[in-house]
Amino acid sequence: MELNGVRVSRETQGRLQHFAELFQKWAKTINLVAPSTVDDLWRRHIADSAQIFQLHPKPARWVDLGSGGGFPGIITAILLAEQKDGHVDLVESNQKKAAFLRVCLRECEARGAVHAVRIEEAPKIVADCDVISARALAELDMLLDYAAPWVERNENLRLLLHKGRDYEREVHKARGRWEFDLVKHNSVVESDSVILELTRPRRRI
């Protein structure tokens, strides 16, 4: 099986398929994503989320903010399962969604933990991380504010963030309070979407 042109193992394919089955089951009772996108689950959500890991396919400690229906956090955890190291901390304050995420981690044999707390509380629980991801959560300046406690602890922190067609406005706004190095990756799934890769984030003085 190939995912965005990258071959994945039979074991990973099985885990992704099982996740898709769990998602379809839970989505009948919990609003995990926009209902209009459920029928396009593999392309719109699974393949789209996989791009994040494929940009940084190394063992790392990930924090996924506002994990919701598992995108990209659960997909990252499943793709990490083939490696010896690496872990995903998924932050989701909604208790029902957090329960869904825990079931997915357990049944898909993916390395991770779910923290059913507000994002502002997460740095007290998860001390360190190498990469922060988020998808359809908040504007860039707010995401940087959320990431600030981890930025202070790790100057090499990397952020990988899904953004839509309005990303340039968000970048301009965020640069009013933050400095950062930026690489824009065009989405291979959605023509009007990008993934922003931020490194060396620091507050403006």
Swiss-Prot record:
Sorted UniProt keywords: Cytoplasm, Methyltransferase, rRNA processing, S-adenosyl-L-methionine, Transferase
Gene Ontology molecular-function annotations: rRNA (guanine-N7-)-methyltransferase activity
Entry's InterPro entries? rRNA_ssu_MeTfrase_G (IPR003682), SAM-dependent_MTases_sf (IPR029063)
Q: Where in the cell is it found?
A: Cytoplasm
Could you give one GO CC term from the UniProt record? cytosol
User: Might you give the EC number(s) for this enzyme?
Assistant: 2.1.1.170
Cited function: Specifically methylates the N7 position of guanine in position 527 of 16S rRNA.
Q: Which family does it belong to?
A: Belongs to the methyltransferase superfamily. RNA methyltransferase RsmG family.
Protein's recorded name: Ribosomal RNA small subunit methyltransferase G
According to its UniProt entry, this protein's organism is Rhizobium rhizogenes (strain K84 / ATCC BAA-868)
Q: Gene of origin?
A: rsmG
